[in-house]
C-alpha cells in the first residue's frame, strides 16, 4: 500500500481516503483545505503568543529585582528590558509593571487567536474560495503565491519599522554603551549610509570582522532596521503588483511542499544567525541582562586579577607569566597592548566596561594604573564568575567554581536551542525540498506503509 499526496482541490474531509494522509500526519491532511489550514496556522500562532505571555508572567512571578536577570534563568524579561521598558541606568530594573503589561497583552491576544483558530478549524469554510476569491488560493497559481509573499514582506517590513519607532520616538532602547555603564537612550541619529549598513554584509564572518554579528552600536542597528523595513515593504509591493518572470517560473517548484521547504530553509538560516548573535554580540544582547559572552568573561577575569595584584604592588606592565609572555599585559602580533594569559585569544573583544581603558594603541597603561573606575571593577568581577560555560573547572582560562553547576547562562540556553532548532529546520528543508522536487518530476509516490503498525490498530473513533 502506498500513501499518495492528494492532488484534488475538492477534498471535503480529513480522512486518509480523501486527503491521502492519515490522522497522525497532522496538517498534511489540510494541504488542499485552505480554510482548515488557516485555522491550524492561527491556532498555532495563538499557542506561540500564549507561551510568550504566560512565560513572561511566570518569569515576573519569580523575578528578584536585586539579582541579575541572567542569574535567574530569564529569557523573556531581558528582551523586554533591551527594548528600554522597566530599566534605568546600568540596566537596573526600576519598574516591573511594563513586564506585567507585556505578559497580559500577549495572553489576551492569544485568546483572540485561539478563538480564530478554533473557528476556522471547526466552523469556518473548508476552503477560503467559498468565502472570497481574494483569500482563496491554489498552490500552483504562481501569481497568487507571489502576491501572498508580497503581503508577508510588507508585514515583516512594518515589524522592522516598529523597532525603529520604539528607538526614535517612543522612549528609546537600552544602550549598553551609554557612558557610565549603560542606560536607556533615544536614537536620534540612525546610520543611513548604505556603505556602512551593507558593509556589514561584505565583512568576513571570522575573527574580529564578524559579519553582521559585529554590529556594536545602536545607530547602526536602528539604521539597518530602517533599510530592511523599507526594502521589505518595497519588495512586498513589487511582488503584489508583478507576476513572476519566466526564469523564476522555470527555476522554482510551485507546490505547497516546495513553499514549506523554502520557509524552513529561511528559518534555519535565521536560527543559525541568531545563535551567533546571542553568543557573541553584547550590544543587541546586553550583558547586563543576558550575562557576559564567553570572551567577555575571560577578559573580565584577566582584568579582575590585574586589579587585585596591582593593588598588592605588582608592576602589571612588566610582570612575566610562566611562558615568558606578559602575565597581565602583552602585545598582540600587530602591536596593540592586550591582556596576557589564556585570554590573549580574545584580544579583539570589545565591551563597554573595558573600552574606556583603551588608547590609540590598545589598552592604555597609564589609564590602567590610574583610571579604573569602581563600576568597571565591580562589573569585571561579576562577569568573571558568570561565564556562559557548563563546566566545573577552568575552561578557556576562566576559573569557574563548584557553585557554577547551578548557573547556566541565558546565552547558553538561547544559543544552544537556536542552533539545535536551526539544524532540525535545515534537515526539514532538505527533506521537503527533496519530496517537492521528486513530486514535480513525477516519481514521488510516498512511503510504503504496508508494515505500518498504526494501520492494524482500531480507529480512534
Swiss-Prot record:
GO terms for molecular function: chlorophyll binding; electron transporter, transferring electrons within the cyclic electron transport pathway of photosynthesis activity; metal ion binding. It is a multi-pass membrane protein. GO terms for cellular component: photosystem II; plasma membrane-derived thylakoid membrane. This is Photosystem II CP43 reaction center protein. The lineage of its organism: Bacteria, Bacillati, Cyanobacteriota, Cyanophyceae, Acaryochloridales. Residues 72-111, 179-232, 290-424 are lumenal. One of the components of the core complex of photosystem II (PSII). It binds chlorophyll and helps catalyze the primary light-induced photochemical processes of PSII. PSII is a light-driven water:plastoquinone oxidoreductase, using light energy to abstract electrons from H(2)O, generating O(2) and a proton gradient subsequently used for ATP formation. Binds multiple chlorophylls and provides some of the ligands for the Ca-4Mn-5O cluster of the oxygen-evolving complex. It may also provide a ligand for a Cl- that is required for oxygen evolution. PSII binds additional chlorophylls, carotenoids and specific lipids.
